[in-house]
Amino acid sequence: VGTGIIEAAICIANGLIIHGVLVENPDGFVEVLVLWFAAQIVMLLVDLVYNKITSYDIHEEIKKNNVAAGIGYAGAIIALANLVRHGVEMHAESWIGVAQNLGVETGLGLLLLPAARFMTDKILLPGRSLTDEIVNQETPNIGAAVIEAFGYIGGSVLICLSFG
């Protein structure tokens, strides 16, 4: 089930990215492909960052069928895809402008992903640890994972709104 949740998040992420690419480039097939490919490369960074900010290996937890770990990771995927969508969707006069938009949005997202996890851990789950709730229990806490996922997604929405 955890793998299915991640697959669903990847589908949602691709939908967000394709939407963002097509909004500003409805007629340019080459531009659409280049931006989509660049966005896919950026999305690979989610895996690296997420594994660094958690004290557990997401891939091992998914192999153990830890649904809660899959939910948290899915939230991170969707959050960064939302930022990538907004970065490529913003109007720019040149490829350099699009790259700058994408870089700023993605950079902020990758920097704030750990901050969102920390704030979720300390503010929304006081006295508890997300890691303990998600991986160190006999039955992983799906509710804590949903809170983590929405912390990431909510943070990405706030970043997008701050850039108009």
Question: Can you describe what each PLM-predicted range is?
Answer:
Residues 22-29, 56-59, 88-99:
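Membrane-interface helix termini and inter-helical loops of multi-pass transporters
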Residues 27-43, 97-113:
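Alpha-helical transmembrane segments
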Residues 40-60, 108-132:
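Alpha-helical transmembrane segments and their immediate juxtamembrane interface regions
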Residues 156-164:
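Juxtamembrane boundary at the C-terminal end of a transmembrane helix
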Residues 3-12, 69-80, 143-154:
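Select subsegments of transmembrane alpha-helices in polytopic membrane proteins
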Residues 1, 55-72:
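Alpha-helical transmembrane segments with an aromatic anchor "belt"
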Residues 126-150:
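Interfacial loop-to-transmembrane junctions
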Residues 14-24, 84-87, 160:
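Membrane-embedded alpha-helical segments in integral membrane proteins
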